[in-house]
Amino acid sequence: MSEFVLQDSRGNTGDRLMFWAKDGAGYTTNLENAQRYTKEQACSQNESRESDLPWPLAYLEALAEWSVDCQYVEPEEVSRELLDATRAHLYASNAWNGNDLVFLTGDGGLTNDLRKAEPFLVTIAVAMAANPVNKVSVIPHLLAVRLARRVIPNGKVKHREALRGTGVILAKPPKYRAPRDRCDHCGVFISDAQRFQDCPKCKGSNAP
């Protein structure tokens, strides 16, 4: 049976999609913690609120990135694990994608995906982080791996492509219809602009 997750499309954290979390725990960017739904359950929720978008779980899993939430990086734990580490990653000290660390790659670029981050020799990483000019911090490789979780960048996924062949039909948001005014004198419908002019039919004034 295909599993689905529900995105709250009203907003992202950085460029990470937000999903309904398991056990009613609000929202999460962590794909592991996203509530699983059957196709029928996902469609039913989308019909109730069109901003809740169903995604096939398998589609997202194939495109997920592994990222580290800065909120779970404890300085004491970093210092302790650096003592025995052989490899470490460097990340920008004052830049985040939502809450996620921005790592350095081997060619001097930046990435949010831990799999693309350069695993520097720990002595080199520590020396670079110690120089304030570099504006980078260090995290041991094994600690980063333990903290990493799968997230979905909105630029890597396409909703129409994901739903192709699933049979899912999205609810259509209700069309907005502007309220129509009537002439205070003869009752004929008038446009918003005509509320401040004489009625085109009876010539009565509708000015406030």
Where do the PLM segments sit?
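Residues immediately within or flanking Cys/His clusters that coordinate Zn2+
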Residues: 176-183, 195-196
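Short aromatic-glycine-(Arg/Gly/Cys) micro-motifs in beta-strand/loop hairpins
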Residues: 3-29, 87-113
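SH3-family beta-barrel domains
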Residues: 1-8, 158-162
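Short Cys/His-rich metal-coordination motifs, predominantly Zn2+-binding knuckles/fingers
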Residues: 183-189, 202-205
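A short, charged, amphipathic alpha-helix used as a generic interaction element across diverse proteins
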Residues: 26-53, 106-142
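Disulfide-bonded cysteine-rich modules in secreted/extracellular proteins
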Residues: 85-92, 180-186
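Cysteine-rich micro-motifs
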Residues: 193-207
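Short, mixed-charge low-complexity intrinsically disordered segments
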Residues: 45-74, 126-175
